[in-house]
Amino acid sequence: MSRRALPWLAAVVWCAAWAGAAHASEAVWEALRAPGSVVVLRHSYAPGSFDPPDARLDDCATQRNLDEAGRAQAGRIGEAFRQHGITVGRVLSSPRCRCLDTARLAFGKVEPWGALQGALRDAELRRRLLMPVRQAVADHRDGPPLVLVTHGSVVSDLTGLDVRMGAFVVLRRGADGAHAAAGQLYVE
């Protein structure tokens, strides 16, 4: 193959990959239109990895929070839902400020729910906290998407997928009545 053909070949491969990703992305948005779908959203960008040891739920100043980029990203998540004609139903969130802020900025409404707080090192406590979350997903059979705004550990425990901040997994109810991941999306 000549050197002059390489840039053209690279461009063709890139365009094919982009078209495939766009098609997959539209399939996930389409899955959101199905009655009983569930969105499991990891909070928008918040610098760092964990809350400080002295963090308190009643004081956002003691927690890891969204920065300007994270707040803008949360707004873009909500805008992407609106652009795709998706009106969400109930929005439940971890009581951590970065999750509550993501939910408010994206969807304008939020109900704090302690079961979504995640990042607990005690495996048994994590399992017990996830039981009502799994039940809420199982009970969501119809209507607009249920949104769960949470942390990476909860997304992973619930879906088996690792997602970056600002990404979400769409769970769609199958013919057997169980929810399964239809895919994940990330809004820059």
For each feature predicted by the language model, list its residue ranges.
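Active-site-proximal alpha-helix that buttresses catalytic centers in soluble enzyme cores
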Residues: S25-G114, A119-D122, L161-H179, Q184-E188
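Sec/Tat signal peptide C-region and signal peptidase I cleavage site
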Residues: W18-A24
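A short, structured loop/turn motif at beta-sheet edges
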Residues: D139-P144, G174-A175
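Bacterial N-terminal signal peptides
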Residues: W8-A17
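Generic beta-sheet signal
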Residues: G36-V38, D142-T150
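All-alpha RGS (Regulator of G-protein Signaling) helical domain and cognate RGS-like helical scaffolds
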Residues: L116-R126, L130-A138
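Bacterial N-terminal signal peptides that target proteins for export
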Residues: M1-L9
